[in-house]
């Protein structure tokens, strides 16, 4: 039997994924049913439920149940391949502890913060929520309520939540868990280009001559893209791969230039590369003269800790962290002079010859370079700077916005781009890159939403880490989370998160599908529908918007987050939540509910249920009497059309395997800012960074600054946290798939063998990781897939029984407010010897 190259790649990827997960190939076969005629299954397309790659899958249903999935061969992203998590998508929905009814803490038949969870009806759940919301609004105004959402919200769920909070309740205290993963990338894009999200696409992989991974373990975190990268590397001998990290991981297996650097010194390396480009005469002077300008960013900006922290008191520019002053090219050249090869090698610990080889990849005009990064860059107290500095390198050489030359920020959630960033569910944002602080943007939003002037507040709300602090301090009284598990995923759990959730003055609601750590710490649990139990849309890392139909119904009384948000809006009259002065501008709203004003407003409700594709259910449309998803999407699309965020018409996406915005005349855009690809670039200009008023990108002069916390005599180790291939984020879905759980049942403490010997422990010994904030126990691993250098330990955060985030520090980037989960100081105590 002969195989085509694609068939071989698919078979090989399946073999690798199965081997990594510790299972035989045969065990994957039950999830790879492909002959519909022989099985009497109904197959439909959907994007994968996991990471931001946006793989397409085919979903098989029978008797109102998902029974199988396989990679979609028609999907451009993955071309029929799935990673090991994707192969088990059909099993994530049917854990034995699936939530199927609302649960309220009760004692003696009524709510009690110290009571036990008891089943209640949806009406009872909304009754207590209504009571708590109205009391909080009366006592503290809009600032007293908050919402924490997700990059796993569908586009219309995030859009509905944004409307309900920012317009309905007039509170900007809504933030997504993407604050923990993508905020630094978003601010980096906005500062450099004036627009968010990558300019390139996945086709860059097949066109590049070199790949540089900055703090990204693509082999495990984006394995399908890694398959494409590996194919490019192995099929083209001239292609090089450079991998940089603070510890060795599986992506190093393909590295031509492997580099382990000291934590935080990626900033030094980035400036060295820029300096090398200039000193070696490799600057594309024509490009930078025409398309860039230079600026010096504010420095000594602090670490996003509480204002009373000594580090914040020393920070001179914490209040103006996101500011800069214009400088010239020669000023930038002078700024970079201290960042020599010798200095970079000394600070980073990377051998000089490897640093120079890396710099030469960027400097060589004949080499097309694709830079990839994710959490190693973004979860960083200077993450925005790191993003700006990688753009500096691509701009200095002109290696940008063309096939193969691409700085590419990878995303970790299926709609961190499509929902958190594009919809604007951050506490400071509005749709299509607009901001609550901009009067023009607020006016545009109020016009599209048909609301009176002054409805939207101008002050940004509390960001994710600050929400936890405000709950603890009693400022936030009511808090609703959806599709997120912050009690496990957030930093400094014991000191800053748990106290706020269990504060007697607060009321916390968690909408989820399983009893997560967060759900168990809440006061009210709402059972949610998941994935294909509802009609949905995600936006992936390459700006690709993808739709799916509802394919099955949710179990029991579980309801979609969209239904929960919209149904709850019926509980409030406008005159109950808006001040009289605002209501006087729209007297016709008096006695109307937030549902009437936000969702039954003549445009969201303008599409009838007759427009739902034949053969598909839609619970929300049936409940509200109109095609809610289509109405929300078409209203949302008004923000971007004509403003370089164009989306196609709703029905187009149900036909296509996704389209990359801007979509003009139903034609997607692969490379932004480049003439011939991007319809917004003016003829004859070649390249235009039109997000900024002068249509130029900014090259930033930004220095190295030390981390918030470093090892010392008492706490001599670095701690870095992250993920593993088999589990996704907090493991609330993947831990319920037997094959994945058995493959990796526990979070291990990855340690250098020499450090283990010094502690008199060995592989399998139990140790305690202790920081100034908390502690966690785990088994030592000295021979596993992750190989830290001496002085650093690595622990994944998927394990709900081993909460490593009890140990982490809640320091954030002062600009993006994104948490640094990669660097804090710990000590290791021996519990038992294996």
UniProtKB/Swiss-Prot annotation:
InterPro entries, A to Z: Asp_de-COase-like_dom_sf, CT_Nitrate-R-NapA-like, MoPterin_dinucl-bd_dom, Mopterin_OxRdtase, Mopterin_OxRdtase_4Fe-4S_dom, MopterinOxRdtase_cofactor_BS, Periplasm_NO3_reductase_lsu, Prok_molybdopt-oxidoreductase
GO cellular component: membrane; nitrate reductase complex; periplasmic space
Residues binding substrate: 797
GO BP annotations, alphabetical order: cellular respiration; Mo-molybdopterin cofactor biosynthetic process; nitrate assimilation
Positions with a binding annotation for [4Fe-4S] cluster: 48, 51, 55, 83
Entry PTM: Predicted to be exported by the Tat system. The position of the signal peptide cleavage has not been experimentally proven.
CDD domains named among the record's database cross-references: MopB_CT_Nitrate-R-NapA-like, MopB_Nitrate-R-NapA-like
Binding site for Mo-bis(molybdopterin guanine dinucleotide): 85, 152, 177, 181, 214-221, 245-249, 264-266, 375, 379, 485, 511-512, 534, 561, 721-730, 805, 822
Stretch forming the signal peptide: 1-29
Cofactor binding comment, as recorded: Binds 1 [4Fe-4S] cluster. Binds 1 molybdenum-bis(molybdopterin guanine dinucleotide) (Mo-bis-MGD) cofactor per subunit.
Main location: periplasm
PROSITE patterns xref list: 4FE4S_MOW_BIS_MGD, MOLYBDOPTERIN_PROK_1, TAT
EC id: 1.9.6.1
Subunit structure, as described in the record: Component of the periplasmic nitrate reductase NapAB complex composed of NapA and NapB.
Protein name: Periplasmic nitrate reductase
